[in-house]
Amino acid sequence: MKFKADEISSIIKERIENFDLNLEIEETGKIISVADGVAKVYGLKNIMAGEMVEFENGDKGMALNLEESSVGIVILGKGEGLKEGASVKRLKKLLKVPVGEALIGRVVNALGEPIDAKGVVNANEYRFVEEKAKGIMARKSVHEPLHTGIKAIDALVPIGRGQRELIIGDRQTGKTTVAVDTIISQRGQGVICIYVAIGQKQSTVAQVVKRLEEHGAMEYTIVVNAGASDPAALQYLAPYAGVTMGEFFRDNAKHALIVYDDLSKHAVAYREMSLILRRPPGREAYPGDVFYLHSRLLERASKLNDELGAGSLTALPIIETQAGDVSAYIPTNVISITDGQIFLETDLFNSGIRPAINVGLSVSRVGGAAQIKATKQVSGTLRLDLAQYRELQAFTQFASDLDEASRKQLERGQRMVELLKQPPYSPLSVEKQVVLIFAGTKGFLDDIAVSRIKEFEDGIYPFIEAKHPDIFEQIRSKKALDSDLEEKLAKAINEFKANHL
């Protein structure tokens, strides 16, 4: 048998040309130690800060500490079955979460994975969890109102689209209720809402979701949950995942509202992670970058300029204080980052004034520009009236005889306090708020007993809707009160008082 040399060489050449060297090179490391949701890994020399890794058991991790001989990795999962010597491989990518319309109405974890047993989330787009906040030129000043449906807030501490307004108070003062009311109030306003629960009991989150479903609010709401039983790393990531989902709507010329409930637990989760990673502790054992932790999160809420679509992302962070101490580390940090705060007080809550908003300590630094003219007109003197009432109230504890003017002021104040009370989960439309506050500040309630203010409120809305529907319509369309409308309104209120009270 003869071999032809040129035949053999052509076959070899063909084999060489068609040879497919498909080698996948993976960089792996070994676990040195693992404890409390943090793994110390040796061998991942080229890893980036914030890079994702995969453990032997399929859990994902994120590199946070890059040291000379090892890498500190937080485990984004239960970490079951991980032991010393187990291998860890680099994924060469940063953490991304799903964004888009597919998430609306769903309950997801901090990685965007569904936890509501309603099947997979079919998202078309994924975005990086850590994004840089928009610069100055991309923004526009806050000028559109975001109505919360809560009388005391819309009149005295107005919130605008793109604002960051802190809700602060002790435990059990109604902070979550204010936030949930605001979400319910966005029905039909074209605002997508995101509720981020950080370190909450699962029963509490289930209750919030149930409330939102009852009021039809889950149709435009995404719930991101990192519960108390979840690893600290997931509690740390949850707000960033939530704001990434919100930014998608803002960047697509829509309006979004995000609630962080609450950032005190977020800071505690970050402190826990940092201490296990052996980062040096600072004040109250928080790490040195705890201010940056919250500032980089809250700066991502913004109102975009017209060239970028004029979308907005409004943030309502919640902070829980201990015994009303607003001067603690985390509260002062977040107060200085946000555009104002709504301060809720235990004493007011216990005395039946709910929502328990302390009008003196609550401010909105940029919301005034967003408030509609009608609300501004009727609530102009309201803050001053309430402040004078509080002062007089303290004074009357020592002095019994009051002059006529002081007595009138005291009585007006009592009625205004009663007027601003509101049951939970019953947000009011702007036109109804304007009518009610107009009645209070213009003295129409001065001759009605304090105990009958609620009766007046319950009756005036259906009365105007039935007999004078044009009043509500004009307030809605004009967004201001002219002399004709004021006259009509005064006439309607007097007519109602004469016939029904």
Curated annotation (Swiss-Prot):
Membrane topology: Peripheral membrane protein
Kinase recorded as keyword: no
Main EC class the enzyme belongs to: translocase
Site residues (Required for activity), renumbered to this chain: 362
Xref: InterPro entries: ATP_synth_asu-like_sf (IPR023366), ATP_synth_asu_C (IPR000793), ATP_synth_asu_C_sf (IPR038376), ATP_synth_F1_a_nt-bd_dom (IPR033732), ATP_synth_F1_asu (IPR005294), ATPase_a/bsu_AS (IPR020003), ATPase_F1/V1/A1_a/bsu_N (IPR004100), ATPase_F1/V1/A1_a/bsu_N_sf (IPR036121)
A Gene Ontology term for the protein's cellular component: proton-transporting ATP synthase complex
Entry EC number(s): 7.1.2.2
Segments passing through the bilayer: none
Compartments in which it is found: Cell inner membrane
Predominant location category: membrane
Binding sites annotated in the UniProt record for ATP: 169-176
Entries under PROSITE patterns matching the protein: ATPASE_ALPHA_BETA
Catalytic activity, reaction form: ATP + H2O + 4 H(+)(in) = ADP + phosphate + 5 H(+)(out)
One Pfam family hit: ATP-synt_ab_C
NCBIfam families: atpA, PRK13343.1
Function text: Produces ATP from ADP in the presence of a proton gradient across the membrane. The alpha chain is a regulatory subunit.
Description of how the protein assembles with itself and partners: F-type ATPases have 2 components, CF(1) - the catalytic core - and CF(0) - the membrane proton channel. CF(1) has five subunits: alpha(3), beta(3), gamma(1), delta(1), epsilon(1). CF(0) has three main subunits: a(1), b(2) and c(9-12). The alpha and beta chains form an alternating ring which encloses part of the gamma chain. CF(1) is attached to CF(0) by a central stalk formed by the gamma and epsilon chains, while a peripheral stalk is formed by the delta and b chains.
Annotated family: Belongs to the ATPase alpha/beta chains family.
Protein name: ATP synthase subunit alpha
Organism annotation: Campylobacter jejuni subsp. doylei (strain ATCC BAA-1458 / RM4099 / 269.97)
